[in-house]
Structures are given as C-alpha cells and as structure tokens.
Amino acid sequence: MEPQTTAKVVLTTTKGPIEAELFAKEVPLACTRFLQLCKSGYYDSKPFYRVLPGELIQCGQQEAGNNTNSYPKLKDEPHTRIKLKRGYLAMASEYTENNRRVPNSATTEFFIALKEIPFSGTVIGKITGDTIYNAQDIARGELTEDGYPMYVQTVQNVEIVLGGGLVQETQKAGADAGADAESRENKSGSRDRPKKPKRKLQVNHDDDDDEEPVFTKKSVSKLVEDKFKKDNTNVAKKPKVEASAEQPEPAAVQATTTHHVQDAEDMTTEVDTVVSERLEKFRNMSRTKPDTKPKSMLISQEDRIRRRLGLGPDEDIPSDASDPSSDEDDDFDIFKHKFICPEDDKAEDSLITLGA
C-alpha cells in the first residue's frame, strides 16, 4: 500500500497550474532539496527543456555559469511502496553515453512521468486532480530536429501550499538520514577491518577458599534418597510444639506401631516355618520308595496253606498239603472249601464263599 503524502506544492506553468504532493517523510533527502529550491525561487522561469511526447517532461537544468558545487549530488532513496507511475514526480539522474543511469547523481532537475516507467531512482511525489492534463499539454508541443521543443514552456513560479514549515523538519530528517547512511557505511567498512586478537582474562583464585562445585550425574533413586534426607533434616530443625490434649501421645503411637510391626514379623516367621516343614516332608516322600505290596499282603507259605485248607493259626498242616502258589495243584478250587472263623468259637461252622 502506498504511503500518504505530507507536503504539497503548486507549480504555475505557461500551460496552467500543476499541483504536486510530496512523500516528504519517506524520501527526506530529495524532498528537502526540492522544497528548498522551490522556496528560494530556483525553479522560477525555468524551462521544460526536455520533452518526450507521451513519456515525460523535464525541468530544473542548471545554467552553465552557475556553480554546480553548491548543489551536491543526492543519494538515491528508492522505496518499495512508491513506484514511478503516470503523473508522478522524480529526481532526474545523469546518464552515460550508453544510456545507463548513474546512481546517486541527482542534483536539482526533476521530471514528470506521463506513463509508468521502470525507474530505480528517487520518486518524490505525484500530481493530483485534473492538473495532470496541463502536464500532458506541455508534452504535445512541436519539437525541433534535435528533439528539443520548438515552443518552450516554463515554470513561472512555485507556491508551497502544505509543508512550508516542514522545510526545517525535512532538513533535520535529511540530516538524520544522512547520518544513518554514514553510520551504515562505517559499519560496513568496519566489517572489512581485520579483527583484533582476543585476549583471555586470567583470574587468580589463590585467595579464594571456596572450591568450585563439582556436578555429578545421579540416578533417580539417589535423587529420591537425597530428597528424603533433606526433608528429614528440615523436620529435625523445626521447633517442637507442645502436644495438645486432643492429639495422641507420640509414645503411644510409637508403641502401637511397634506392636503392629512385631505381629507382622511373627506372622512372617510362622508362614516361613510352615512352608519349610511342607517342603521337607515333600522331599522325604520323594526319597522313600514304597513297597510293591502292602505289609498286610506279605504272608508266609504256611499261612497261605492254612487259609487254603481253612485251618486255624494253631492247627497243624497236613503233610500232603501243597503251596497254593505252586503249579502242582492247578485243579484245586479255593471257592469250594470251608473256612472257619477262629474269632467265634461258639458259633457253628459257616461256609464262606469268596466272590459271592
């Protein structure tokens, strides 16, 4: 967005007035020079000596007899938000034989653009209202073979409508801008200077009794332990407060806590004892090999014969009786023999049939 103008002048020409507003705040150096020239009457009776129809008209050429050193060259002040459009004023620069603009060469001349022109110099203002047509009338004049206007149009006088009191302010702003430019140049020049060697500052710590702290990396558990130690130290440093009647006695609390701790330890001991006993029993069981037959089944050969013949424990065994476990008497049927219960002497003989 284009900035606002802060000054205004009216150029009275032979074709009519041309009202121009200036960007005095954005381009202080060029606007200061232009306002000074207008106030001193420099542009009075100055011709528009250069006319390019449909392109531009230029004014403010210095006469050959004037001292050109009284108007030093201005530094270019291009602005990113101010472009050279139709009806805008700009400070004229010098050009080489190859038609190349010489930077930082503007002095007193200005020109009015009649169309948008690519320009990298300093644009100082713009024409307002319908007075742009008076500038176009100046460009319509006839030209000679050399390209100069046949009927020269001139600036009769210049009136400062707005910003007459800003000449001093613009001078101050221009001086500040020049100082800033010089300081920037000095800074840029100072960058090229060789750097001074750096000197290390040595400090003698012999008189200091305190040693520099040594920082070590600690684990989380170590940090927590240090924190609890610090908290316990702070608690020990706190003043003792008398216990009220409502609060329990510290001794009773300590005794209760000790009792619970003792119970827990006893319970742990009992559990360990039971577990140890069961483990020992299990180990003994695994070490002992059980008999292939129960003790009740291990009987002698005579007892087997007595049971086979149905004899009591005190009765004699017949000489022709054989062992029931041998293979000599396979036809003997144990279920057909009579068994007598020795416990019941008075009872009659009863026939017990096995497997019934």
From Swiss-Prot:
Q: Which GO terms describe its biological process?
A: mRNA processing; protein folding; RNA splicing
SUPFAM superfamilies reported for this sequence:
Cyclophilin-like
The EC designation for this entry is 5.2.1.8
Q: Does the keyword Membrane apply?
A: no
Record-linked Pfam families? Pro_isomerase (PF00160)
Q: Annotated Gene Ontology MF terms?
A: peptidyl-prolyl cis-trans isomerase activity
Region annotation (Disordered) maps to 172-214, 234-266, 279-331
Q: Name the enzyme's class.
A: isomerase
Q: Which reaction does it catalyse?
A: [protein]-peptidylproline (omega=180) = [protein]-peptidylproline (omega=0)
Q: Where is the composition biased (Basic and acidic residues)?
A: 181-192, 279-294
Q: Residue limits of the PPIase cyclophilin-type domain?
A: 5-205
Q: Which UniProt keywords apply?
A: Cytoplasm, Isomerase, mRNA processing, mRNA splicing, Nucleus, Rotamase, Spliceosome
Q: Which domain of life is it from?
A: Eukaryota
Q: Which InterPro entries does the annotation name?
A: Cyclophilin-like_dom_sf (IPR029000), Cyclophilin-type_PPIase_dom (IPR002130), Cyclophilin_A-like (IPR044666)
As for subcellular location, the record says:
Cytoplasm; Nucleus
One GO CC term, this protein: catalytic step 2 spliceosome
Sum up the protein's function in the record's words: PPIases accelerate the folding of proteins. It catalyzes the cis-trans isomerization of proline imidic peptide bonds in oligopeptides. Involved in pre-mRNA splicing.
| Similarity annotation | Belongs to the cyclophilin-type PPIase family. CWC27 subfamily.
How does this protein assemble? Associated with the spliceosome.
Q: What is this protein called?
A: Peptidyl-prolyl isomerase CWC27
